[in-house]
Regions:
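Beta-rich carbohydrate-recognition and catalytic domains
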Residues: 1-99, 105-131
Length: 131
């Protein structure tokens, strides 16, 4: 079996500072086709992503996978809504409050959209949670 990939456009689909809150670090994208049972969808495609030092998980949406993409400026999950710390006295290189690396799955049988993500625990470990 041969697997190949093809770039759909010449530039990035998500750019730094697409909205006033986003910042410049964009990583960990997870794309889904919005399920038909989601009420009032923003678009056909949802792209979840983060800033590894960010305090919220972001969402972009589009009618076509090629774009144009628009950001949902409030984001979808703030660190304060997660089970992770919002403040810390730790001083290690990676010991800052954050939520990042969204991995989103459509659970058609249960009518759920599950998002796995990670963040910082009180002891400095980084763990995965689900929303």
């Amino acid at each position: 079996m041969t697997v190949s990939t093809k770039r759909l456009s010449d530039g990035p689909i998500i750019r730094a500072n697409m909205d006033g809150r986003m910042g410049t670090n964009i990583n960990g994208p997870s794309l889904i086709e919005c399920p038909h049972w989601v009420p009032d969808p923003l678009g056909v495609y949802y792209l979840y992503f983060a800033d590894h030092r960010g305090t919220y998980l972001r969402l972009a949406y589009a009618e076509d996978v090629k774009g144009p993409w628009h950001t949902y400026e409030p984001g979808v999950l703030d660190v304060a809504q997660s089970s992770f710390v919002t403040e810390t006295q730790l001083d290690g290189e990676f010991d800052y409050p954050h939520v990042a690396s969204p991995d989103v799955h459509v659970m058609s049988k249960t009518g759920e959209v599950r998002m796995y993500y990670h963040g910082l625990c009180e002891n400095g470990d980084q763990m995965t949670a689900v929303a």
